[in-house]
Amino acid sequence: MEKIEISTETIQLDQLLKLAGAVPTGGAVKPLLEEKRILVNGVPETARRKKLVPGDVVSLQMEEGEKHYKVVLY
């Protein structure tokens, strides 16, 4: 599981995935959400701008396998 450090209390889901290098742009998150390939704390997420807090775990189901990111405070 890759840890993504943030220096604020929250981060939006699309921003986190951009920061992690999982997507090239925030807009690239939309089709992944529509296909229910993004889970937040084990639950399928539909909101691109979902606010994440330290401790949240984001799972991204890609063709090459699953990637997991944990939000941690910097």
Residue ranges and their predicted role:
Residues 11-54:
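A basic, amphipathic helix-loop patch mediating RNA/tRNA/ribosome contacts
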Residues 47-74:
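C-terminal structural segments of small proteins and small subunits
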Residues 1-11:
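A detector for short, charged/polar N-terminal pre-domain segments
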